[in-house]
Amino acid sequence: MVHSQEVVIGPDRRLRVTLEVEQGKLRSWAVQLEWWDPEEGRPVWVARYDTAGGRDHRDRNRIASHEPVDLPEDRGEAARVAERELSLKAEEYIEAYRAAKAQGRKAW
């Protein structure tokens, strides 16, 4: 079963948290920072931590994909750490995204 939740962390930003639970165990997860891009007139994903491909990693839109990260082995704790990281450093991630966009780097 997949559980999704949006957590508003500011007037122009939110976290999208997705947990896949099977037989009471957390199988996979993703925590994504989204920001309202005034130039595009819509929310865009800026950064996310997830378990796609079987390994915990971070993706940063326009910057890097599948960056290795040091997270706890426990999947639930790893998801909580990722959520805290994106919440606390949201401004840094958004500014890096904006800089990459200004340089003409492509979104994906």
Q: Which stretches of residues belong to each language-model region?
A:
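Small/flexible residues
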Residues: 1, 15-18, 50, 60-64, ...
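Negatively charged, low-complexity tracts enriched in Asp/Glu with abundant Ser/Thr
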Residues: 1-39
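Compositionally biased, intrinsically disordered low-complexity segments
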Residues: 10-12, 49, 97
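Compositionally biased, intrinsically disordered low-complexity regions
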Residues: 12, 26, 55-56, 106
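A short, structured beta-strand/loop element
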Residues: 28-68
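Acidic, low-complexity intrinsically disordered segments
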Residues: 61-108
